[in-house]
């Protein structure tokens, strides 16, 4: 039976990416799209690349009849998302793409997002949406908390290494390059073409980036003790993609073997042969992740690279992967999209 889908916040980049992928999903049908500021418009007017798809017009959230919806994707900003989800029917399955339900500790949420959490009852039932590590929990979840795109990239590189005990937990550095679509669609001066093209800049450096909250939570959980990493993201003048270069202390061959073993049976995660490094070009527009490992000239140190598309595996693609599990569908359904190259 075809699953009826609503996308809340469909006028943003992640909402558009959800619509693009679900349009060819054999077991999902989009029956409602919300975009309050663009209510009444056709999706093809907001995103011309979706003109050929027979999508419903954008409406305000309160105009949607959720009684016939099987699952809702919530692609709204943090704080807004929790308020909206709190008003949805409690038997409705929800995949939230915002940061609102990622952090289990209310104090940590307030620390990183600057305001108290207003729906802790929902937070208690949310399952963190890093699919390959929470697969069984997601199969029975009602509410999924989608990961941050940067947080997903860093965890794919580091989490198996903590599990395998092959790195020094006190010396982890994540240097990450992110495409500009990760900053959203809102008009911002630093995202103007003249401000960004031809250059790059770090942002939220010095331990200020919000995705550090996810790293702290998840790495510490796996290690069984506090783990803190250095993390500096950089805004790049390309649209899609994340490339994380991770510096760790450990034997390079053991690190490569740990990643290869952990992801051996994962469809969307490919560990490249030792010495080959990941590239954003090779995964653009897809739900695939490439990981590469190489030794450093300094003995006992390794460099791990991970590439993913921030809008697909870093957000909307992974959201659909999680929704498949929640709806009892094959996990890869609708997601075997070949990367776009060049």
UniProtKB/Swiss-Prot annotation:
List of catalytic residues: 149
GO molecular function: N-acetyl-gamma-glutamyl-phosphate reductase activity; NAD binding; NADP+ binding
Location in the cell: Cytoplasm
Superkingdom classification of source: Bacteria
Keyword list, A-Z: Amino-acid biosynthesis, Arginine biosynthesis, Cytoplasm, NADP, Oxidoreductase
Class of enzymatic activity (EC top level): oxidoreductase
Protein EC: 1.2.1.38
Gene Ontology biological-process entries: L-arginine biosynthetic process
Gene Ontology CC: one annotated term: cytoplasm
Entries under Pfam families matching the protein: Semialdhyde_dh (PF01118), Semialdhyde_dhC_1 (PF22698)
Reaction catalysis annotation: N-acetyl-L-glutamate 5-semialdehyde + phosphate + NADP(+) = N-acetyl-L-glutamyl 5-phosphate + NADPH + H(+)
Protein's UniProt keywords contain NADP: yes
Pathway: Amino-acid biosynthesis; L-arginine biosynthesis; N(2)-acetyl-L-ornithine from L-glutamate: step 3/4
Described function: Catalyzes the NADPH-dependent reduction of N-acetyl-5-glutamyl phosphate to yield N-acetyl-L-glutamate 5-semialdehyde.
Family designation: Belongs to the NAGSA dehydrogenase family. Type 1 subfamily.
The name this protein goes by in its record: N-acetyl-gamma-glutamyl-phosphate reductase
Source organism: Rhodobacter capsulatus (strain ATCC BAA-309 / NBRC 16581 / SB1003)
